[in-house]
Protein backbone atom coordinates (compact mmCIF):
# COMPACT_ATOMS: atom_id res chain seq x y z
CA UNK A 1 0.00 0.00 0.00
CA UNK A 2 1.18 3.51 -0.82
CA UNK A 3 1.45 6.27 1.80
CA UNK A 4 -0.64 8.75 -0.20
CA UNK A 5 1.91 11.55 -0.26
CA UNK A 6 2.25 11.37 -4.02
CA UNK A 7 -1.22 12.80 -4.54
CA UNK A 8 0.07 16.37 -4.25
CA UNK A 9 3.14 15.91 -6.44
CA UNK A 10 1.47 14.40 -9.49
CA UNK A 11 -2.13 13.25 -9.08
CA UNK A 12 -4.97 15.77 -9.24
CA UNK A 13 -7.58 16.20 -6.56
CA UNK A 14 -10.44 16.14 -9.06
CA UNK A 15 -9.54 12.57 -10.02
CA UNK A 16 -11.11 11.40 -6.75
CA UNK A 17 -14.81 12.03 -6.13
CA UNK A 18 -14.64 10.93 -2.47
CA UNK A 19 -12.05 10.11 0.16
CA UNK A 20 -12.97 6.44 -0.26
CA UNK A 21 -12.07 6.70 -3.94
CA UNK A 22 -8.68 8.03 -2.93
CA UNK A 23 -8.18 5.19 -0.43
CA UNK A 24 -9.07 2.67 -3.12
CA UNK A 25 -6.40 4.16 -5.36
CA UNK A 26 -3.81 3.31 -2.71
CA UNK A 27 -4.85 -0.36 -2.52
CA UNK A 28 -2.92 -2.78 -4.72
CA UNK A 29 -4.40 -6.00 -6.14
CA UNK A 30 -2.06 -8.05 -3.96
CA UNK A 31 -3.49 -6.34 -0.84
CA UNK A 32 -7.02 -7.44 -1.72
CA UNK A 33 -5.76 -10.93 -2.49
CA UNK A 34 -4.46 -11.40 1.04
CA UNK A 35 -7.05 -9.36 2.94
CA UNK A 36 -10.12 -10.43 0.91
CA UNK A 37 -11.98 -7.40 2.30
CA UNK A 38 -11.96 -3.99 0.60
CA UNK A 39 -13.32 -2.13 3.66
CA UNK A 40 -10.55 -3.59 5.83
CA UNK A 41 -8.02 -2.61 3.19
CA UNK A 42 -9.38 0.96 3.28
CA UNK A 43 -9.08 1.07 7.08
CA UNK A 44 -5.47 -0.08 6.90
CA UNK A 45 -4.68 2.54 4.28
CA UNK A 46 -6.34 5.25 6.39
CA UNK A 47 -4.40 4.17 9.47
CA UNK A 48 -1.22 4.35 7.44
CA UNK A 49 -2.03 7.96 6.52
CA UNK A 50 -2.21 9.21 10.11
CA UNK A 51 1.35 10.48 9.95
CA UNK A 52 1.09 11.74 6.38
CA UNK A 53 -0.38 14.97 5.01
CA UNK A 54 -3.53 13.44 3.59
CA UNK A 55 -5.88 12.38 6.34
CA UNK A 56 -9.62 12.57 5.66
CA UNK A 57 -10.06 16.13 6.94
CA UNK A 58 -7.13 17.39 4.88
CA UNK A 59 -8.44 15.60 1.80
CA UNK A 60 -11.86 17.28 2.16
CA UNK A 61 -10.20 20.68 2.61
CA UNK A 62 -8.04 20.23 -0.47
CA UNK A 63 -10.97 18.90 -2.46
CA UNK A 64 -13.10 21.94 -1.59
CA UNK A 65 -10.25 24.30 -2.47
CA UNK A 66 -9.75 22.59 -5.82
CA UNK A 67 -13.48 22.88 -6.62
CA UNK A 68 -13.52 26.57 -5.66
CA UNK A 69 -10.51 27.19 -7.88
CA UNK A 70 -12.20 25.41 -10.78
CA UNK A 71 -15.38 27.47 -10.44
CA UNK A 72 -13.41 30.73 -10.16
CA UNK A 73 -11.40 29.86 -13.23
CA UNK A 74 -14.54 29.12 -15.22
CA UNK A 75 -16.08 32.41 -14.14
CA UNK A 76 -13.01 34.39 -15.20
CA UNK A 77 -12.93 32.69 -18.58
CA UNK A 78 -16.49 33.79 -19.36
CA UNK A 79 -16.11 36.96 -21.39
CA UNK A 80 -18.18 40.05 -20.85
CA UNK A 81 -20.50 40.92 -23.71
CA UNK A 82 -18.70 44.26 -24.14
CA UNK A 83 -15.22 42.71 -24.38
CA UNK A 84 -13.44 43.49 -27.64
CA UNK A 85 -16.24 45.70 -28.96
CA UNK A 86 -15.63 49.09 -30.57
CA UNK A 87 -17.90 51.29 -28.47
CA UNK A 88 -18.65 54.42 -30.48
CA UNK A 89 -21.32 56.00 -28.28
CA UNK A 90 -21.21 57.38 -24.73
CA UNK A 91 -24.18 55.24 -23.75
CA UNK A 92 -22.53 51.98 -24.84
CA UNK A 93 -19.34 52.96 -23.04
CA UNK A 94 -21.34 53.70 -19.90
CA UNK A 95 -23.01 50.27 -20.09
CA UNK A 96 -19.65 48.56 -20.63
CA UNK A 97 -18.18 50.28 -17.56
CA UNK A 98 -21.02 48.88 -15.45
CA UNK A 99 -21.42 45.43 -17.02
CA UNK A 100 -19.13 43.42 -14.74
CA UNK A 101 -20.47 45.00 -11.52
CA UNK A 102 -24.07 44.35 -12.59
CA UNK A 103 -23.33 40.76 -13.52
CA UNK A 104 -21.54 40.07 -10.23
CA UNK A 105 -24.26 41.63 -8.05
CA UNK A 106 -22.05 44.41 -6.70
CA UNK A 107 -24.30 46.96 -8.40
CA UNK A 108 -27.90 47.12 -9.60
CA UNK A 109 -28.21 49.86 -12.22
CA UNK A 110 -31.48 51.24 -13.56
CA UNK A 111 -31.38 52.74 -17.06
CA UNK A 112 -33.92 55.37 -18.09
CA UNK A 113 -34.36 55.56 -21.87
CA UNK A 114 -36.68 57.83 -23.85
CA UNK A 115 -36.80 57.37 -27.61
CA UNK A 116 -39.07 56.34 -30.50
CA UNK A 117 -40.25 52.87 -31.45
CA UNK A 118 -40.53 51.49 -35.00
CA UNK A 119 -43.92 53.25 -35.41
CA UNK A 120 -42.44 56.63 -34.55
CA UNK A 121 -44.18 56.68 -31.16
CA UNK A 122 -42.27 58.16 -28.24
CA UNK A 123 -41.69 55.54 -25.54
CA UNK A 124 -39.73 55.46 -22.31
CA UNK A 125 -38.84 52.95 -19.63
CA UNK A 126 -36.88 52.33 -16.48
CA UNK A 127 -34.80 49.23 -17.23
CA UNK A 128 -33.26 46.87 -14.67
CA UNK A 129 -29.82 46.48 -16.26
CA UNK A 130 -28.76 43.48 -14.14
CA UNK A 131 -31.99 41.66 -14.96
CA UNK A 132 -31.71 42.33 -18.68
CA UNK A 133 -28.08 41.15 -18.71
CA UNK A 134 -29.16 37.80 -17.31
CA UNK A 135 -32.13 37.37 -19.64
CA UNK A 136 -30.73 38.73 -22.92
CA UNK A 137 -27.63 38.49 -25.09
CA UNK A 138 -26.05 41.96 -24.99
CA UNK A 139 -23.39 41.37 -27.65
CA UNK A 140 -25.68 42.67 -30.45
CA UNK A 141 -26.21 45.88 -28.43
CA UNK A 142 -22.52 46.46 -27.77
CA UNK A 143 -21.60 45.64 -31.38
CA UNK A 144 -24.16 48.14 -32.68
CA UNK A 145 -26.32 45.56 -34.47
CA UNK A 146 -29.32 46.30 -32.22
CA UNK A 147 -30.47 49.14 -30.01
CA UNK A 148 -31.49 48.64 -26.41
CA UNK A 149 -35.10 49.82 -26.33
CA UNK A 150 -37.86 50.00 -23.71
CA UNK A 151 -40.08 46.94 -23.30
CA UNK A 152 -43.45 46.50 -21.65
CA UNK A 153 -41.74 43.94 -19.39
CA UNK A 154 -39.33 46.52 -17.93
CA UNK A 155 -39.69 48.02 -14.45
CA UNK A 156 -41.78 50.86 -15.84
CA UNK A 157 -42.89 51.39 -19.44
CA UNK A 158 -44.80 54.32 -20.94
CA UNK A 159 -46.02 55.04 -24.48
CA UNK A 160 -46.48 58.78 -24.80
CA UNK A 161 -48.70 58.48 -27.89
CA UNK A 162 -51.15 55.89 -26.56
CA UNK A 163 -50.58 56.80 -22.89
CA UNK A 164 -50.19 53.10 -22.18
CA UNK A 165 -48.18 52.37 -19.04
CA UNK A 166 -47.08 49.22 -17.29
CA UNK A 167 -45.11 48.44 -14.13
CA UNK A 168 -43.33 45.20 -13.29
CA UNK A 169 -41.26 44.04 -10.35
CA UNK A 170 -37.97 42.38 -11.25
CA UNK A 171 -35.56 40.04 -9.49
CA UNK A 172 -33.75 43.09 -8.11
CA UNK A 173 -36.40 45.78 -7.64
CA UNK A 174 -39.92 46.29 -6.37
CA UNK A 175 -41.80 49.13 -8.07
CA UNK A 176 -43.58 51.58 -5.76
CA UNK A 177 -46.21 53.59 -7.63
CA UNK A 178 -48.18 55.02 -4.71
CA UNK A 179 -45.91 58.00 -4.14
CA UNK A 180 -47.01 61.64 -4.61
CA UNK A 181 -43.68 62.70 -6.13
CA UNK A 182 -43.42 59.84 -8.62
CA UNK A 183 -41.97 56.37 -9.00
CA UNK A 184 -39.77 54.75 -6.40
CA UNK A 185 -37.79 51.52 -6.70
CA UNK A 186 -37.04 49.38 -3.67
CA UNK A 187 -33.90 47.27 -3.99
CA UNK A 188 -34.66 43.71 -2.89
CA UNK A 189 -31.04 43.06 -1.91
CA UNK A 190 -30.71 45.73 0.77
CA UNK A 191 -34.28 47.17 0.92
CA UNK A 192 -33.06 50.69 0.16
CA UNK A 193 -35.18 53.08 -1.88
CA UNK A 194 -34.02 54.58 -5.17
CA UNK A 195 -35.76 57.82 -6.10
CA UNK A 196 -35.71 58.69 -9.82
CA UNK A 197 -37.20 62.17 -9.37
CA UNK A 198 -34.58 64.53 -10.93
CA UNK A 199 -35.43 67.16 -8.32
CA UNK A 200 -34.62 64.79 -5.44
CA UNK A 201 -31.52 62.93 -4.31
CA UNK A 202 -31.54 59.35 -5.63
CA UNK A 203 -31.03 57.86 -2.17
CA UNK A 204 -28.50 56.05 -0.02
CA UNK A 205 -25.77 54.22 -2.00
CA UNK A 206 -27.27 55.54 -5.25
CA UNK A 207 -26.12 58.02 -7.90
CA UNK A 208 -27.79 59.67 -10.90
CA UNK A 209 -25.78 60.08 -14.13
CA UNK A 210 -27.24 61.78 -17.24
CA UNK A 211 -25.64 60.40 -20.42
CA UNK A 212 -25.31 62.36 -23.66
CA UNK A 213 -25.99 59.87 -26.45
CA UNK A 214 -26.37 60.09 -30.22
CA UNK A 215 -28.51 56.96 -30.14
CA UNK A 216 -31.37 58.14 -27.90
CA UNK A 217 -33.41 61.24 -27.12
CA UNK A 218 -32.80 61.00 -23.37
CA UNK A 219 -30.71 58.66 -21.19
CA UNK A 220 -30.10 58.62 -17.43
CA UNK A 221 -28.37 55.85 -15.48
CA UNK A 222 -29.08 55.29 -11.78
CA UNK A 223 -26.41 53.21 -10.07
CA UNK A 224 -27.21 51.49 -6.78
CA UNK A 225 -24.22 49.93 -5.05
CA UNK A 226 -25.00 46.86 -2.94
CA UNK A 227 -23.32 47.18 0.43
CA UNK A 228 -22.25 43.97 2.12
CA UNK A 229 -23.75 43.58 5.63
CA UNK A 230 -21.39 44.29 8.51
CA UNK A 231 -20.34 41.50 10.84
CA UNK A 232 -21.14 43.69 13.83
CA UNK A 233 -23.81 42.21 16.12
CA UNK A 234 -27.04 44.17 16.24
CA UNK A 235 -30.69 43.72 17.09
CA UNK A 236 -32.68 42.58 14.03
CA UNK A 237 -35.27 45.04 12.76
CA UNK A 238 -38.85 43.82 12.71
CA UNK A 239 -40.60 43.75 9.34
UniProtKB/Swiss-Prot annotation:
Pfam families: DUF4464. GO terms for cellular component: cytoplasm; nucleus. InterPro entries: DUF4464 (IPR027887). The keyword Nucleus applies. Its main location: cytoplasm. Keywords: Cytoplasm, Nucleus. The keyword Nucleus applies. May be involved in spermatogenesis. This is Cilia- and flagella-associated protein 299. It comes from Danio rerio (Zebrafish).
